[in-house]
């Protein structure tokens, strides 16, 4: 544990940080939480806890902290500590809350003076039962430079059913309240009963943990990890495993806490991103094993805002790539040997129409929603049931058995705002309609032809036999044979040309290959290949929309190369150098005055917007997006938003290793 001090002048024009002390913990353990408070006018008190069931109390004397007491009682790792004054009086007793993996919260009283405080009546709580005998009320004495203090056990708070991650004090409406969050998917408020002095849970928010069937005992790491008060104390937020913030705001008129729209997002690397064919919404896939749909909430009198509106796929494998087949259908690939195709359900289509002004096609034949059977990975189409209807479970075949918690009522699909996490995790899956088999290893790339008729796929490979590209016809969902064989290592990216005449593939073998459509509409044959397209592996590729077929390749050799097909040959027309390995590249569909834009991203998170002229591809102008709004890690994919009119500014969606999906607006300042 290191103690630091800020050093600054009177006007704060220069600020420095000075190391005061390094505390070596004994016995050794990993400190997980610290709490610091003013003990008296001269001294500070520091509480340290972690991977041992004890709390160490350090008191400062002449800027140096010394171990003064060790508080025992917990039976598991301690995850949270927080100090507060009992009342608004600065001389009132100091209270310390400690929360542990033993499912309990303990309160400790720091009392100034040589006499002990009155024994807390909270220990007379009948809910404690047989625990009372095991509760020690031993007094610990600590001294500062000017005063003496006692530390006594004040209360034991029971109510959570799993590990507790947060304990946070707040003086609210003249009352002292404690906020706690737990692995049991709940957030609780605690308050001392004015009559008996017993600490009771006055409000509980969140979910019923049993519905999820996961606890810390089964290896789950779910629940609510963080709980925070708003500055005015009338709102609280919590963050959990799925990456969603949950927000509740207190309504004095209704005397209840109401859930509000909050921020959601991926929690691990985002590997793939694609727009719907009309650009109305965005799909992203991640190694957090989810595919998520983002769109703009459009309201009269309010600016449009981006939100997660559906979680089409919640999988058991890390997801690697995704592409849209139509406005209501997409295909995704994961760390498994097959690809899965999903169709939009009626519930999602109607919600997007209502909240995002996305015109829905005929929804009468669509299923209402989807759910996952207890022992399955595939989303099954289901019909929502009325609020009063009883549901029969599939008793004859346990593989078709449905978790009662996943039953979807019609009222659960009626939204007036973007869905909360509870709905995203259960009610807004998309039914899986097809599986595409053929590959022998994990899927690495997928691309859909511009007309939506062909899906091209590739998998991880270390030999020519496995580094093939497989094509599937979207009408019959059958593989178009033979597979395309040219690469010797993993194919990292696939792209169809704007007219579907060509298919471009690039790979870790440093090779790019152009395949040409043959007389049979679904067949492609090798037309051009360059086994040394880059000096290091090629990580991404893209076609431009110039009249002359022109494509881009991005390599680990820190360059983007511009190639053009002229008659029967491919010529290198230009090279754009970058400051790091280029991991993503994409070209705008908009061509103006013979010029177009393309964007590229690097493994350091840098994004460049380049302007290229069809007549001078060797002279490319590059503008770098400010580091302040750039991702912190590798750019995995960039996609330009389709369907933008001339009056609308162009936009790009960026998938990054830092778990973010970002949308940037690209404007031409010279216009």
What is the predicted role of each segment?
Residues 1-6, 55-60, 81, 105-110, ...:
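WD40-repeat beta-propellers
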Residues 20-24, 67-70, 154-156, 212-216, ...:
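A short beta-strand motif characteristic of beta-propeller blades
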Residues 26-39, 76-88, 161-171, 212-231, ...:
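Canonical WD40 repeat/beta-propeller blade segments in eukaryotic WD-repeat proteins
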Residues 41-47, 88-97, 174-179, 188-189, ...:
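Structural hallmark of WD40 beta-propellers
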Residues 48-52, 98-104, 110, 181-186, ...:
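Conserved strand-to-loop turn within each blade of WD40 beta-propeller repeats
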Residues 85-89, 161-181, 270-355:
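Repeat-solenoid scaffold signature
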Residues 104-106, 111-158, 186, 198-223, ...:
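Terminal intrinsically disordered, low-complexity extensions flanking WD-repeat/beta-propeller proteins
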Residues 413-501, 506-508, 513-516:
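Alpha-solenoid helical-repeat scaffolds
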């Amino acid at each position: 544990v290191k103690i630091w001090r800020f050093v600054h002048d009177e006007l704060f024009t220069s600020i420095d940080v000075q190391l005061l002390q390094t505390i070596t913990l004994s016995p050794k353990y990993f400190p997980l939480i610290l709490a610091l408070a003013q003990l008296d006018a001269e001294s500070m008190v520091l509480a340290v806890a972690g991977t041992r069931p004890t709390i160490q109390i350090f008191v400062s004397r002449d800027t140096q902290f010394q171990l003064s007491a060790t508080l025992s009682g917990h039976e598991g790792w301690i995850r949270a500590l927080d100090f507060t004054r009992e009342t608004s009086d600065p001389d009132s007793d100091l209270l310390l809350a400690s929360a542990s993996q033993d499912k309990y919260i303990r309160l400790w009283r720091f009392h100034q003076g040589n006499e002990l405080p009155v024994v807390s009546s909270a220990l007379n709580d009948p809910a404690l039962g047989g625990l009372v005998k095991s509760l020690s009320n031993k007094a610990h004495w600590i001294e500062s430079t000017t005063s003496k203090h006692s530390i006594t056990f004040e209360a034991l708070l029971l109510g959570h059913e799993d590990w507790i991650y947060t304990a946070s004090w707040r003086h609210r409406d003249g009352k002292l309240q404690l906020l706690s969050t737990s692995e049991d998917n709940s957030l609780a408020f605690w308050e001392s009963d004015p009559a008996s002095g017993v600490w009771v849970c006055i409000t509980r928010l969140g979910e019923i943990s049993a519905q999820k069937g996961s606890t810390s005992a089964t290896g789950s790491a779910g629940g609510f990890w963080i709980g925070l008060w708003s500055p005015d104390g009338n709102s609280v937020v919590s963050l959990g495993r799925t990456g969603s913030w949950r927000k509740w705001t207190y309504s004095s008129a209704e005397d209840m806490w109401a859930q509000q729209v909050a921020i959601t997002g991926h929690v691990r690397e985002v590997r793939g991103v694609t727009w719907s064919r009309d650009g109305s919404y965005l799909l992203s896939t991640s190694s957090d094993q989810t595919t998520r749909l983002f769109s703009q909430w459009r309201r009269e009198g309010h600016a449009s805002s981006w939100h997660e509106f559906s979680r089409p796929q919640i999988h058991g494998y890390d997801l690697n790539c995704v592409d849209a087949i139509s406005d209501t259908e997409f295909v995704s690939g994961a760390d498994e040997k097959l690809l899965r195709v999903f169709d939009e359900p009626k519930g999602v289509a109607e919600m997007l129409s209502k909240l995002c002004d996305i015109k829905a096609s005929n929804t009468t034949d669509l299923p209402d929603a989807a759910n996952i059977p207890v022992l399955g990975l595939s989303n099954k189409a289901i019909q929502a049931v009325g609020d009063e209807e009883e549901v029969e479970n599939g008793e004859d075949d346990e593989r078709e058995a449905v978790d009662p918690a996943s039953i979807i009522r019609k009222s659960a699909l009626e939204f007036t705002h973007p869905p909360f996490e509870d709905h995203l995790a259960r009610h807004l899956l998309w039914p899986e309609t097809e599986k595409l088999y053929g590959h022998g290893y994990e899927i690495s790339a997928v691309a859909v032809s511009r007309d939506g008729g062909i899906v091209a796929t590739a998998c991880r490979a270390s030999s020519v036999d496995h580094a093939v590209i497989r094509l599937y016809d979207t009408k019959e969902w059958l593989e178009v044979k033979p597979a395309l064989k040219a690469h010797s290592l993993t194919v990292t990216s696939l792209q169809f040309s704007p007219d579907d005449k060509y298919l471009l593939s690039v790979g870790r073998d440093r090779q790019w290959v152009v395949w040409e459509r043959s007389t049979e509409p679904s067949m492609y044959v090798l037309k051009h290949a360059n086994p040394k397209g880059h000096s290091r592996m090629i990580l991404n590729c893209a076609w431009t929309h110039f009249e002359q077929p022109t494509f881009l390749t991005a390599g680990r050799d820190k360059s983007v190369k511009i190639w053009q097909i002229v008659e029967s040959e491919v010529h290198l027309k230009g090279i754009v150098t970058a400051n790091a390995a280029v991991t993503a590249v994409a070209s705008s569909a908009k061509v103006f005055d013979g010029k177009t834009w393309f964007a590229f991203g690097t493994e350091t998170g840098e994004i460049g917007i380049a302007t290229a002229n069809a007549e001078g591809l060797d002279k490319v102008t590059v503008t770098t997006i400010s580091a302040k709004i750039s991702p912190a890690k590798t750019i995995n994919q960039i996609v330009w938003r389709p369907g933008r009119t001339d009056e609308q500014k162009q936009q790009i969606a960026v998938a990054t290793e830092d778990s973010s999906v970002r949308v940037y607006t690209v404007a031409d300042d010279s216009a």
